A protein has these predicted regions:
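Short acidic/glycine-rich loops and adjacent helix/strand connectors
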Residues: 1-121
Length: 121
């Protein structure tokens, strides 16, 4: 299961198995809130119903790199806020408990999104 944008902008979920996209959905389609940054149970349940329970969660950025960027930018409060750490954020979704999280390089996730949704082999 890939999770993108959750916590701060345009939350989305995808399920990919053996290079095939089994499910892709945006939180805003479920909540009817434009650019919704919060995942919701309906979206996650649909993802699991279509693609099966994931064996790993691929998170769209490395949280410690983000915290370092916030520190360098002088965003002291944000850099110290642990409520936005993916492991804590995902605790509110029981269907994702005990699934390991693998953190990805943020810009690589953008590239993967373009690659996997393109019509080219």
């Amino acid at each position: 299961m890939g999770i993108s944008g959750a916590i701060n902008h345009d939350a989305a979920v995808s399920i990919v198995h053996d290079g095939e996209i089994l499910f892709a959905g945006h939180a805003e389609r479920y909540s009817k809130k434009k650019n919704d940054s919060d995942l919701n149970d309906a979206l996650l349940n649909d993802a699991i119903n279509y693609g099966g329970k994931p064996d790993i969660i691929a998170w769209y950025e490395k949280p410690m790199l983000k915290k370092l960027r916030q520190l360098r930018a002088g965003q002291w409060q944000l850099s110290l806020d642990t409520s936005e750490l993916p492991s804590q954020y995902l605790e509110k979704f029981p269907q994702l408990k005990h699934i390991p999280i693998k953190y990805q390089k943020h810009h690589y996730t953008h590239a993967a999104s373009g690659y996997f949704t393109s019509p080219y082999d």
